[in-house]
Amino acid sequence: MRDRITGAKALMRALQAEGVETIFGYPGGSIMPVYDALFDYTRGEKKCFDHILVRHEQAATHAAEGYARVSGKVGVALVTSGPGVTNTLTGIADAMLDSTPVVVIAGQVATTALGTDAFQEVDLVGVSQPISKWSYQIRRAEDVAWAVSRAFYIARSGRPGPVVLDFARNAQVEQFDWEPKKVDFIRSFVPYPKFDPDSVRQAAELINHAQRPLALVGQGVELGNAQEELKMFLEKADIPAGRTMLGLSALPSDHPLNVGMLGMHGNYAVNLKEQECDVLIAIGMRFSDRVTGNLKTYAKQAKVIHLDIDRSEIDKNVKAHIAVVADCKESLPALTALIQPATHRVWRDSFRELDEKERQKVIEPAIHPQSGPLLMGEVVNAVATQAPKGTVLVTDVGQNQLFATRYFKYTQKRSICTSGGLGTMGYGMPAAIGATFATDRTVCCFMGDGGFQMCIEELGTIMEQQAPVKMILLNNNYLGNVRQWQDMFWMRRKSFTKMLNPCYELIARGYGIPYQCVTDRTNLASAVEKMLTSQGPFILECAIKEDDDVLPMTPPGMNVNDMMLEI
């Protein structure tokens, strides 16, 4: 018996077949047939999706990112054409740079109107191709099942990333005989390359002869679900490991081989030791400029082993002496089997003196100040101290991101959501919304007053969904990171970084969200406890010292061993 359905209904079935449970979206004219079909799939006996109505399409993509980061599934955003889809481009680019699997489905004008500058017509395939893994226009209803299956396969396979589907309106309403499709192979796409055993043997030989090995751990470990394989490798060879910002929860904070965060605002010892190690093992990381500093002088003394699933990352920034191109879920066990048990106690102990120097000059003054206004570090520390085990950290971008990632504690995998590659202000709140739909764990979102106001409309989404986001607003009345750079490198000429802020208490009250403001550190612990024990969303505003600076810091263009502990 024939099963004739519309392209819009076919989309519902195709999403259901991919295991989609949550959709973040905003309706509009060219996507209305899909939203009409969605109506039946979000209520009653047919219910299989939760649709989260955001207040801006950019938030739909960031929420899908947060959902994907924490759940390990593909996030889905659904929007209309024209400004609806152009609003998603920042989120698509963010997902591309941070390897986040997201499928953005957008309405489009009918195929008969393409190229006529019709109302809300945008060449979505053209504008999204450079910032997505695959971008495709669905022109016929019968192509829906194939396109959706292919989109999800590409988004989640290999190095994950965003995929864009441009859904012509006529294809949404056309009827056809439904036939499910499953794409699990694309001839020109090799998502999981098989590693070369010779490369693994050579890497093992280098590691076995190393006196000062250092591992650099990136998000690829989390994306490959290789946290346990990483631990076994590090522990057998006794190798200290630094983590990138996106890889922070790949190794627990309290693991004895964890030596801190990499990067220009990372930990002092691990940055300096990159210039002293004799073997550098990069695992699922891409040698970002925020990690390496000046490439001309970076780790020139070391033999570099690079394990990555994406061949294009090999030799892109740092020349690898040995490359192992494969999923680290497979390559790490193979490497572990060939390395010899080792002890590098003297090398590991050499980190401690530098750690102590950072603790005295930077960490203690930041998290345990004796007087003066509140500092960001002490607020982060207060939240981290009381937060339940497994809490998910979400940050916006700016000083809030740098303080939060430095001083939070990571005990469980997939516990960090932040915009690493693109550095997107306004990311935090919607990403935190997405995270709450991916997990029952506590979600804490740190934002500055600048980023908070870039996504403030999403308080409406939080209100409507009662999403239990614990929002910590670090309010210093400045665009703090830019202000710090102006003070350090631009002769203190604070050009348009001072902010006149609204009354956040009135805003919170308008959205019906519990709120408390802390201006004195004697009230900080009790306010944090109140926030963390609340049942739904909560805004904790903290009045922060205006010139609170993030340290340590590697000045731009300098070497990682030029890291500054004081200004």
Describe these PLM feature segments.
Residues E21-T22, R69-T80, V85-A106, Q129-K182, ...:
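Structural signature of the thiamine diphosphate
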Residues I105, A113-Q120, N271, E276, ...:
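Thiamine diphosphate
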Residues A8-M12, Q16, V34-L38, D355-A438:
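Active-site diphosphate/adenylate-binding microenvironment
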Residues R2-A93, L97-D98:
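N-terminal cofactor/phosphate-binding cores enriched in small/glycine residues
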Residues A106-A147, G247-E353, V528:
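Glycine-rich, acidic loop regions that bind phosphate or pyrophosphate groups
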Residues M1-R2, E142, E205, Q301-V397, ...:
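Phosphate/pyrophosphate-binding active-site segments
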Residues R169-P197, Q202, W347, E358, ...:
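Aromatic-enriched
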